[in-house]
Amino acid sequence: MKLNSVLTLLFIALFTACKGGAYDLSGYGLKPDTGENASPLIAKALQEIAAEVNFDTVRILLPKGRYDFYPEGASKREYFISNHDQDNPKLVGLAFENMKNVIFDGQGSELVFHGRMLPVSLVGSENCTLKNFSIDFANPHISQVKVLENDTVGGLITYEVAPWVEYEIRDSNFVAKGEGWEHVPAWGIAFEGDTKRLVYTTSDISVGSKHVAEIASRKILAPWKNKKLIPGTVVVFRGYG
């Protein structure tokens, strides 16, 4: 009797997870707005779905809400990505591999990643659609600063670090920090503070991240010569990767 009950419950769970070519990820244990790590659950779900799909078109449905992804339990993949750092394996939040005729519908969900992760990969697949979700990082790998003063004669710029950026001044270097990562930014992109457009005739620029001093809370004085960075300019720092 117990065996029959277990088999019945298993059948119901499978039927709930997959119905008419649609896989509801809640049937794999994924629940929104809990703050819990969704990485191992979605890794297991996508692996199982890829192994058993037998419909012309498959829909994978993620109940609307916020999902947090952490490196622990995430899919590990070896990818070599153009214009990207080449450390491997990479930790992937949603790894879509060897899939065909798949529609992934996040139904308006917010996917928030923590640490150093690759949010989504789509490899060896065809005719796939990923839609209705947003991607963000709890602590982005870029650092935003605003130019306060620019001494073009002395080659010094004073800038203010955005309140959400984690950093420290270590050995006179501006060190951006996050969950499981840190770097001294090497390059940046400059935006006009009022219009948010790229500063005219600029692309990647070198940034003042070395030999700096913190002269007040979140205010940095740096040897940095660039006459185009007028006060109010917003610069987004990034590393090499």
What residues fall within each predicted segment?
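Sec-dependent N-terminal signal peptides
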Residues: 5-14
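A structural signal for beta-strand register positions
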Residues: 66, 108-110, 134
